[in-house]
């Protein structure tokens, strides 16, 4: 399958886009076709073995329109050219329409003045007054009309061409309506001439008042005025992305062979050393090699506070170096940069169609033929009821010019384009219109714990000394832990470094599996580990041990430290909750969304996190491979589910969910399994994404309502339905004005989304009274049986294990379980602190528990 984007020319309304879509969709091999009227583009997914680009272009041309392959973004400037090509085209269209409008007004104003002046009492030259000058009066109007028709000839060229091809569009309605007025006006000139020849002044007077040239000219000018305003508004729909692309630098300072030089951005190569000075834009994505800086990433990630950068940190192209000087190595250039990927994602999203637009698409396909039929029937009906030709003709013209298929075609894409652009500015990348629509109806948000609710990195939360002083305890602990590879050790070392404490000399370092580490710190034997280690070495301190248990109840991991047989204190380490997680969860709950947390932790730790952030429900002890099953279980219960995860370990769950949201993507925005990508690691952006989705869908519904309501009311009024009862009849010029402004209204309403701002409240998390009403449940990992080739029954059991802290621990447990007779396979997972074993019927739970305990760890439960 291949997916390509095409630029389509000649479309003017929803009927045009509908015809192009149908023409391509019926080609053999075409799987999916989406035409975007706003962007004049088409995305086609097709089977290359059955269909080619040339055949697709030929199908569009046969339908009466032009098509060409869309330029593919390359480097940042190329991306800018490709994406802003639409903006440039919109700007050119606006410029052309302004010229057409100015020239049209140049002739329409005197035409209108001449035709209406005698009725309004305006001064007119004597040669235009009185019945004796009727021919001069009529012919001058005709001459003033001709340049207006020529200036707006495109309506006739396209309108009659599509009518001839039996696929009439909005231009057909304009061409038919104005042509009817012109033909009748020419007929009136002949009748005036005949009247003069026969000296029939009554005929002269009658047709002198029924010329309709001013109606034809004014209709064309008013529609051009509306299209000018529409073109201006359309140009603003892509403002967000245009401004984003404007940030991309055109040049970069590169250092090659010790020589600095300024080169065009497209010449930057992978691995180049680049120099970025204060006030300059970061040219491409890369890694800081030397120097420090404060970088403003707000344009890409929505993060308002500048981010401090130093050697080893990543930087994103198109962000601004606010202060400092640094050297960087280019790691992503051209189409691979975050900026280019953002442009591509937004471009694809704005080219896609939301399911909500399907009704409008169906109506657009038959709208124009139905309107023409109504106009013919209305004209004939009024003639048959004895009304004058002038009256019946004005009815028919009014029906033709008031009908507006454009509003139907613009209702959805304008809101989608502005909404996705606004999301991109806030660091929220929505990949498709369908994802945007689905998000607004989500009623359950599932959050992965690690890295989503929490920081994903252990930090020191509590330091409790046993009398030797906090700094002394940290210094001793960090000195010993510095030799360990354990993740919790890194947290203690980082805390000591942050406080600039002294690291002491350590000898005879030793790791004790399942317990901790030991060594001599400046000649004194130091033990560091869990409570089991303290008990094994007969070290007691009831007060400190009790405090450790209390910290464990809060979901923290207490590490005890003893010096020469005496407990000197404990340090608690935990993966702490992000500052905004509780607020974000409270906001989601206030929007009527149930929040569920999935975690591999045991129920005790899960409950501690739940109490901190106020989630509605927690599913604990979930293995990474089982997250997708939990999502499916929620969906089977009738829930519309959004899954929020890191996009890597959670890929199956993200793909299974109705909406997959990858959080904290940073520069990696092309996460395949996600429908929405959040560049920041902030749960508040989930709330923002839901609010934005609801705002966009509400806007689309407003637009569609207006488009249907306008036509449903306007067409009957124009047809004279209310004339017998209320003498309500629409002038064709008023109909043209109404039609022009209906499209302008739809686009202008969509532009309101440019000022969308998420409402974030400082809401406190819901209070949880006690674990008894916690809503924490253990994942449904039922024991599964299967028959092997020999007919033996293998069972799968899941063991929850305490005490594992690193990959060494994982290896120890795996070896211990694999050595148990009857165990076919053992898989140990550090994140969920569990082991999944495949065993035959002879293996007992007691044997598995004994194997884990003998390895120095604790088997908490076996399922």
Language-model features and meaning:
Residues 55, 61-70, 74-81, 85, ...:
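Actuator/coupling domain of P-type ATPases
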């Amino acid at each position: 399958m291949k997916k390509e984007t095409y630029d389509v020319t000649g479309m003017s309304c929803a009927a045009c886009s509908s015809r192009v879509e149908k023409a391509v969709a019926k080609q053999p091999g075409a799987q999916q076709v989406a035409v975007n009227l706003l962007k004049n583009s088409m995305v086609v997914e097709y089977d290359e073995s059955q269909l080619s680009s040339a055949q697709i272009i030929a199908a569009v041309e046969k339908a009466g329109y032009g098509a060409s392959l869309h330029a593919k973004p390359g480097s940042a400037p190329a991306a800018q050219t490709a994406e802003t090509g639409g903006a440039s085209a919109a700007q050119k269209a606006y410029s052309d329409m302004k010229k057409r409008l100015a020239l049209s007004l140049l002739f329409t104003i005197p035409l209108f003045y001449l035709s209406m002046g005698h009725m309004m009492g305006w001064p007119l030259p004597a040669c235009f007054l009185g019945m004796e000058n009727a021919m001069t009066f009529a012919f001058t109007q005709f001459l003033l009309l001709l340049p207006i028709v020529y200036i707006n000839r495109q309506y006739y060229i396209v309108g009659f061409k599509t009518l001839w091809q039996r696929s009439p569009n909005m231009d057909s309605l304009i061409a038919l309506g104005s042509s009817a007025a012109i033909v009748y006006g020419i007929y009136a000139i002949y009748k005036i001439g005949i009247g003069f020849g026969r000296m029939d002044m009554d005929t002269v007077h009658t047709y002198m008042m029924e010329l309709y040239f001013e109606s034809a000219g004014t209709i064309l000018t008013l529609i051009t005025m509306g299209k000018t305003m529409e073109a201006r508004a359309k140009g603003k729909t892509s403002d967000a992305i245009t401004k984003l692309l404007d940030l991309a630098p055109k040049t970069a300072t590169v250092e090659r062979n010790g020589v600095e030089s300024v080169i065009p951005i497209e010449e930057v190569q992978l691995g180049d050393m680049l120099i970025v000075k204060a006030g300059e834009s970061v040219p491409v994505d890369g890694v800081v090699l030397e120097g420090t800086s404060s970088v403003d990433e707000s344009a890409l990630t929505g993060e308002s506070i500048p981010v401090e950068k130093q050697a080893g940190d990543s930087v994103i192209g198109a962000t601004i170096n606010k202060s400092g000087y640094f050297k960087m190595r280019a790691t992503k250039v051209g189409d691979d940069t975050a900026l280019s990927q953002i442009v591509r994602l937004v471009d694809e999203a704005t080219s896609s169609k939301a399911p909500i637009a399907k009704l409008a698409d169906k109506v657009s396909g038959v709208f124009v033929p139905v309107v023409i039929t109504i106009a013919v029937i209305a004209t004939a009906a009024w003639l048959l009821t004895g009304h004058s030709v002038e009256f019946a003709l004005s009815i028919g013209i009014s029906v033709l010019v008031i009908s507006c298929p454009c509003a139907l075609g613009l209702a959805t894409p304008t809101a989608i384009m502005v909404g996705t652009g606004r999301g991109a500015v806030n660091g929220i990348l929505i990949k498709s219109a369908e994802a945007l629509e689905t998000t607004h109806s989500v009623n359950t948000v599932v959050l992965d714990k690690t890295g989503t609710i929490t920081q994903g990195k252990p930090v020191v939360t509590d330091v409790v000394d046993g009398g030797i002083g906090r700094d002394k305890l940290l210094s001793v602990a960090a000195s010993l832990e510095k030799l360990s590879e354990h993740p919790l050790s890194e947290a203690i070392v980082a805390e000591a470094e942050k406080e600039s404490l002294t690291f002491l000399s350590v000898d005879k370092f030793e790791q004790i599996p399942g317990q901790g580490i030991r060594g001599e710190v400046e000649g004194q034997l130091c033990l560091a580990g869990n409570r089991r280690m303290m008990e094994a070495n007969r070290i007691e301190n009831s007060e400190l041990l009790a405090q450790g248990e209390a910290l464990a109840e809060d979901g923290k991991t207490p590490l005890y430290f003893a010096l020469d047989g005496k407990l000197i204190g404990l340090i608690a380490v935990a993966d702490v909750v992000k500052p905004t997680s509780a607020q974000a969860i409270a906001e989601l709950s206030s929007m009527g969304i149930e929040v569920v947390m999935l975690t591999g932790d045991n129920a005790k730790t899960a409950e501690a996190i739940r109490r901190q952030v106020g989630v509605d429900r927690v599913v604990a002890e979930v293995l990474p491979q089982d997250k997708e099953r939990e999502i499916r279980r929620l969906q089977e219960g009738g829930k519309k589910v959004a899954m929020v995860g890191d996009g890597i370990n959670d890929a199956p769950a993200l793909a299974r969910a109705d909406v997959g949201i990858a959080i904290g993507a940073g520069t990696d925005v092309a996460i395949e399994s996600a429908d929405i990508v959040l560049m920041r690691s902030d749960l508040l952006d989930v709330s923002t994404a839901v609010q934005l989705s609801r705002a966009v869908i509400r806007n689309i519904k407003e637009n569609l309502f207006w488009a249907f309501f306008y036509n449903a009311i306007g067409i009957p009024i124009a047809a004279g339905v209310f004339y017998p009862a209320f003498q309500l009849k629409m002038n064709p010029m008023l109909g043209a004005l109404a039609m022009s402004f209906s499209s302008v209204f739809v686009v202008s309403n969509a532009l309101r989304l440019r000022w969308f701002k998420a409402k974030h409240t400082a809401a406190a998390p819901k209070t949880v009274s006690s674990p008894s009403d916690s809503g924490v449940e253990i994942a449904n990992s039922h024991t599964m049986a299967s028959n092997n080739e020999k007919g033996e029954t293998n069972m799968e059991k899941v063991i929850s294990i305490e005490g594992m802290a690193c990959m060494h621990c994982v290896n120890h447990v795996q070896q211990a379980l694999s050595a148990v007779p009857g165990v076919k396979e053992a898989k140990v997972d550090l994140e969920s602190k569990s082991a999944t074993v495949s065993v035959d019927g002879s293996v007992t739970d007691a044997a598995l528990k004994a194997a884990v305990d003998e390895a120095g760890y604790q088997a908490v439960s076996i399922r």
